[in-house]
Amino acid sequence: EQQRYLNAKKYVKLFLVADYIMYLKYGRNLTAVRTRMYDIDNVITPIYHRMNIHVALVGLEIWSNTDKIIVQSSADVTLDLFAKWRATDLLSRKSHDNAQLLTGINFNGPTAGLGYLGGICNTMYSAGIVQDHSKIHDLVAIAIAHEMGHNLGMDHDKDTCTCGTRPCIMAGALSCEASFLFSDCSQKDHQEFLIKNMPQCILKKPLKTDVVSPAVCGNYFVEVGEECDCGPPRTCRDPCCDAATCKLRQGAQCAEGLCCDQCRFKGAGTECRAAKDECDMADVCTGRSTECTDRFQRNGQPCKNNNGYCYNGKCPIMADQCIALFGPGATVSQDACFQFNREGNHYGYCRKEQNTKIACEPQDVKCGRLYCFPNSPENKNPCNIYYSPNDEDKGMVLPGTKCADGKACSNGQCVDVNTPY
């Protein structure tokens, strides 16, 4: 599973924000600020392409009336405020994986930016801030790539790290020289982070229509108006795609995709993805497109020796969820512990309505907080929950989990598996 995750193409749906000082700095000219940000995005894209990550700019916001947070010269305070604003305001308006604030303010000391280590896909911590510290947009783009690198699990380079001649992107200090490469250490950090955490949001490919930056032929991503994109003409080796126009060559039906072979659609019924497990199904080509549509067993089909029911292609059971939260020795707590879910507080509730925690009804107690027994020498408490104020949903029983014979959790209720849920 880890190898399949590592090999999968990754996509970071990026949202860029420019603050009010940026707007003033560029003469209150929205087009100038926008162009600056598009230019920066066009530098970030090829940097991450080398890491098998496509960065797609899915949102851009310029604070042209007033700042939506108090931007200040203390970088850590500003990052904290920006991350909270993203979590509570921006995410509810626009789906994205990572947000970066570009500011015209001068941060204290030598700091040009700040980002949370390993924050990608986290509601609270997938964010960074960067000072617009140079007229040369390449250098500012590299600073954003650096903070995104932190979010993607990369630490600062040590003296022994190398990427060729120049200092690399994750160097601890700013350089006047532009470096477009990650070091061997950064690549190792990133790979280890991916294996350990397997962040899911970056597996989802954005739609062409999600991208807000003007289409650029040669950036490896098929955008509106393009049929294919195999990168710059000097490096493209794709026989199906004309790199200069991003159009299919004469006679070609397709250039990429699991149902494309030698520029032609694979025949209808050709298997394009094997079934991963008992809740999945083998996927087949239609003969009319390159898409390999993911199909899975119907929700409610018994799985894992009748310990669970299939739900959206997975088999969620409490035992696995306890192990994921508390480690390999953990088991599900006794039924009595789940009665805490009738309290309607941080430690026990079934769902939230307008941020109010709703207590579980007696029949729904196994669809609220998950209670586990860690079974470790230092923790003999029989009723444990995982609780984090920054991510309250983590530690709740997952949707689709079996809560009784013939029943599964849906919206904090234990419902019959034969009803749609």
Swiss-Prot record:
Ca(2+) 2 binds at D280, M281, D283, D294, R295. SMART domains: ACR, DISIN. The active site is at E147. Disulfide bonds join C121-C201, C161-C185, C163-C168, C217-C246, C228-C241, C230-C236, C240-C263, C254-C260, C259-C285, C272-C292, C279-C310, C303-C315, C322-C372, C337-C383, C350-C360, C367-C409, C403-C414. It is an enzyme of class 3 (hydrolase). Zn(2+) binds at H146, H150, H156. Ca(2+) 1 binds at V216, N219, F221, E223, E226, D229. GO terms for molecular function: metal ion binding; metalloendopeptidase activity; toxin activity. It is found in: Secreted. Keywords: Apoptosis, Calcium, Cell adhesion impairing toxin, Disulfide bond, Fibrinogenolytic toxin, Glycoprotein, Hemorrhagic toxin, Hemostasis impairing toxin, Hydrolase, Metal-binding, Metalloprotease, Protease, Secreted, Toxin, Zinc. Residues 214-299 form the Disintegrin domain. Its cofactor is Zn(2+). Binds 1 zinc ion per subunit. Glycans are attached at N29. One of its GO terms (biological process) is proteolysis. PROSITE patterns: ADAM_MEPRO, DISINTEGRIN_1, DISINTEGRIN_2, ZINC_PROTEASE. One of its GO terms (cellular component) is extracellular region. Expressed by the venom gland. Residues 10-206 form the Peptidase M12B domain. Belongs to the venom metalloproteinase (M12B) family. P-III subfamily. P-IIIc sub-subfamily. Snake venom zinc metalloprotease that induces apoptosis in vascular endothelial cells (VEC), without degrading the extracellular matrix (it cannot cleave collagen) or inhibiting adhesion of VEC. Has also fibrinogenolytic and hemorrhagic activities. This is Zinc metalloproteinase-disintegrin-like crotastatin. It comes from Crotalus durissus terrificus (South American rattlesnake). The lineage of its organism: Eukaryota, Metazoa, Chordata, Craniata, Vertebrata.
